[in-house]
Amino acid sequence: GVVEISVSTRPDCVSAEYLDIMRDIRAMTGIQMNVELGLQTANYHTLQMIDRGHGLAEFIDAVLRIKRYTGISICTHVILNLPGDTAADAKETARILTALGVDIVKLHSLYIARNTRLCDWYENGKITVCSKEEYFERVITFLEQIPETVAVERMFSRIPEKDAVFCNWGCSWWRLRDELLQKMEEEGRYQGKCCDYLNGAALCLLKSE
């Protein structure tokens, strides 16, 4: 039978009307509810550049509204190698998701589809994509900043090769995954390793001194 209903939407399309319906369905059926929100990055300059049509405030509002309902989990989609973003943006995005208490994260590696605005920018040299090594570093930095209780359901994304001008540095997603996990193991890095910045962390630092 059905064990979960997952609704994927934009942060600026979440309202009490729809959340009430999800709450009622859960009450009648006992089925777990999940809302998937596409944030992509906490950098509002990048959100504007890629024409997302919403900012960080709408995402925060959506999460806080969903949090008022029991039995509705939150999954957030993030792209860590958007043009203009840096490792600092990956870190700050992770920290915001942690502070908001999201339950699930899906990481996407940027691919550039043919016949799109990004494709034109990429082919004309207006934008570049970071190296595979830099992406690995951003993913690991992101993972270190989120609690180990957050489920990470994806770390790479892809489309058919014929439809893309750039996708995963020409590598298969499973090879990238294996390389990433090996790098984390070799460097002693893991999810949640640096998740110690909430609950008045500065006060704790002062006390330790």
Language-model features, listed with the residues they occupy:
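Aromatic/hydrophobic pocket-lining residues that form the small-molecule binding cavity
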Residues: 59-60, 86, 90, 135, ...
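Hydrophobic faces of well-ordered beta-strands that scaffold small-molecule active sites
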Residues: 5-7, 33-37, 74-78, 105-107, ...
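Surface-exposed alpha-helical segments enriched in charged/polar residues
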Residues: 20-23, 64, 68, 95-98, ...
